[in-house]
């Protein structure tokens, strides 16, 4: 606790890094949402599906009906533009977080690490005075301009970025990644037909080189970014590394998010120099004196947030078994591109009285993304089983020109899964009635044991 007390959270520092970070995050959210809309993903992922896989405790978050689902995306566009401009920031920052997080909570089959990262960043933006310079709020005198802000308002974002990198590196210290170069062997092989680098990428040693370098990079890049002496070289490495991963791996916009976000590690002078290139009519600035009671409250909240962010990636250690198999504590733990998992899931609805059963065609109810994700993720399998039970309870079916009514159906599935290039293994035995297994945080002892060979 003595070390914590010595941390000077409230030392004043230039607001410039916070201003640029505000603009960068707003731009990412704006462009990312436009990309999402132009690709037609709103319709494919949030309008067409018949069911959604909500997060435990957030099942009450439901999609809007039909084309109303465009509304939260429009709100993101508006609020992200306002965040960029620093306009009505007190309202636009919370709106950006709420509208984006609402979308992310709808369906875990769309979970991506950088979406989770952006939810955290937009949440933190609510509590920092990122609009107190270079903003329309200042221009229209809605707020008093500030040249400086407390150190924690910038440090909290550096911490969050550090968490992403360091835990991503720690997660790579495992057998599949370092000793088997998986799943990189699989993904790099997909580029073997490239005219320039194809013959190189199919070489096994290249996959091992990428695996080991990726582990070392993630674990230590933050420390080089924090040092003024090595920062420029480290950032060049950030750009090259993330460009290569974007080019070779199915990783979405994550590399671009990290490239622009890590600019916050640069010195205040660096950011001030950027802002100085733009004309800005400065007004008289103020420095706010934070009362001791407020300091204690802020310090407590910061420490609580830090501890929470340290616990979440480590919660998997509370469970037994292979993490890639049971996925207990896998999400929100910054395990970036560590797993290639494929599954084949055949579901059956069985009448409890007649024992007659029918095989389900999953594509009739699920999108391609949902089916792919569900077939390997235990919690989603249970949710799908509950959906099928509700769907077929007391329903009437016509089979071979005969009419049957299903009473109190049980849901069974025969599921085989392959992890990181291994042969497909039995994941869930057909004998289980999946509709009777509660969807909780309890250990998933109903899964078949994992053979790591």
What do these predicted regions represent?
Residues 1-453:
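Alpha-helical membrane-anchoring segments
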């Amino acid at each position: 606790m003595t070390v914590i007390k010595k941390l000077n959270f409230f030392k004043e520092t230039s607001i410039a890094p916070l201003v640029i970070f505000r603009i960068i995050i707003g731009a990412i959210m704006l462009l990312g949402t436009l990309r999402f809309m132009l690709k037609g993903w709103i319709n494919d992922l949030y309008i067409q599906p018949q069911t959604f896989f909500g997060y435990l405790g957030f099942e009450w978050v439901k999609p809007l009906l039909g084309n109303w689902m465009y509304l939260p995306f429009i709100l993101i566009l508006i609020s992200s533009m306002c965040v960029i401009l620093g306009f009505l920031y007190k309202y636009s920052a919370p709106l950006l977080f709420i509208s984006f997080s609402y979308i992310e909570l709808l369906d875990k089959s769309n979970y991506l690490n950088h979406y989770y990262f952006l939810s955290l960043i937009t949440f933190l933006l609510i509590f920092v005075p990122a609009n107190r310079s270079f903003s329309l709020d200042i221009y229209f005198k809605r707020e008093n301009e500030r040249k400086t802000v407390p150190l924690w308002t910038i440090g909290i974002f550096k911490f969050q970025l550090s968490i992403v990198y360091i835990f991503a590196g720690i997660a790579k210290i495992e057998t599949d990644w370092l000793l088997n170069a998986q799943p990189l062997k699989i993904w790099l092989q997909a580029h073997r037909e490239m005219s320039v680098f194809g013959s190189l990428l199919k070489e096994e040693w290249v996959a091992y080189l990428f695996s080991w370098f990726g582990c070392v990079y993630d674990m230590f890049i933050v420390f080089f970014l924090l040092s003024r002496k090595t920062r420029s070289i480290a950032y060049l490495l950030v750009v090259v590394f993330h460009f290569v991963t974007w080019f070779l791996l199915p990783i979405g916009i994550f590399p671009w998010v990290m490239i622009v976000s890590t600019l916050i590690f640069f010195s205040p002078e660096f950011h001030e120099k950027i802002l100085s290139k733009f004309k800005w009519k400065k007004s008289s600035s103020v420095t706010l004196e934070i009362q001791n009671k407020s300091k204690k409250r802020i310090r407590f909240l910061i420490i609580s947030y830090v501890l929470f962010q340290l616990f979440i990636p480590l919660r998997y250690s509370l469970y037994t078994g292979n993490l890639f198999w049971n996925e207990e504590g896998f999400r929100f733990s910054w395990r970036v591109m560590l797993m290639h998992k494929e599954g084949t899931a055949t579901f059956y609805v069985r009448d409890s009285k007649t024992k007659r059963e029918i095989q389900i065609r999953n594509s009739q109810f699920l999108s391609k993304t949902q089916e792919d994700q569900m077939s390997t993720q235990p919690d989603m399998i249970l949710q799908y089983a509950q959906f099928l039970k509700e769907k077929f309870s007391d329903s009437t079916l016509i089979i071979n020109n005969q009419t049957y009514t299903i009473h109190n159906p049980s849901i069974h599935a025969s599921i085989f899964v392959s992890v990181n290039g291994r042969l497909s293994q039995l994941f869930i035995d057909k004998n289980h009635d999946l509709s009777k297994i509660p969807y909780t945080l309890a250990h998933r002892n109903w899964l078949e044991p994992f053979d790591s060979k």
